[in-house]
Amino acid sequence: MKKFVYLLILILFACQAKNKETSNIVSVSILPQKYFVDQITGDLVHVNVLVPPGSSPHNYEVLPSQMKALAQSKVWLQIGLLTFENAWKIKFTDINKDLKIVNSSEGIIPIPGSIDADQEHSGTFDPHVWLAPAEIKIIAKNTLNALITSFPEHAGSFMVNYNRLLQKIDSLSGQIEQKLAPLKNRNILIFHPALAYYARQFKLEQIPLEMDGKEPSPKHMKDIVDLARKQNIRIIFIQKEFDAENALQLSREIGGEVVVIDPLDYNWEKQMLDITEKIATQK
């Protein structure tokens, strides 16, 4: 049935690529990327987000409206480390033969990830590169270059906005460093290990409850409880799309607090500050 639907979509939208020369559509994999494209382009392009608000890369299925936008897109800006990107690449290029595909994370040193039972990760690397300002500067530069290539007539405006964005990112990095500087307890408890790049930049240690994409074993939970009590860790982060049962159980054991974060939120800057504020409460 899925193959039939895909073929039907392919037939319906393949002809759309003929008008792509006048298109101002840019496709991105996840919502935070839209934030950065918007920061660089203003209202000069339309952004098609493949994983829409409230959805997850874990169970991604393309919508007909997204296929239509992809058929008109000049470029697809990938994160480059998400499994669905590889899974759908051939199908997307079948619909739009001229689609330029750009790995926005090119130049980032990837962090090895665990085996993910939900298949979010492509290969063996952690995909959450957008959750650290240092990596975002690389992503922003790759995004700028791709946008200038696709829309050279707007290069001047893009450069002005890009430089303004870099200033915001540098300012945010400084704020985070300042808030975390007094911190002696530099451990982060998190259900799904999404903060590895953040931890690398700001010299923190990420401790995941999840193991290889699976629920924590009783032994692992006991080890985490012992560690949290010993080091006075009281904050447990969990992404909003995950079941909070184990995190809540752990919080009761250590007298802690479960904090829900949304790595896929559009407002990237606010997410970074909210995460930092909570980490900074752990003296």
Model regions: which residues?
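Extracytoplasmic metal-acquisition and chelation regions
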Residues: 16-283
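Short, intrinsically disordered low-complexity segments
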Residues: 1-2, 17
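Sec-dependent signal peptide recognition
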Residues: 2-8
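C-terminal motif of bacterial Sec signal peptides marking the signal peptidase cleavage site
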Residues: 12-14
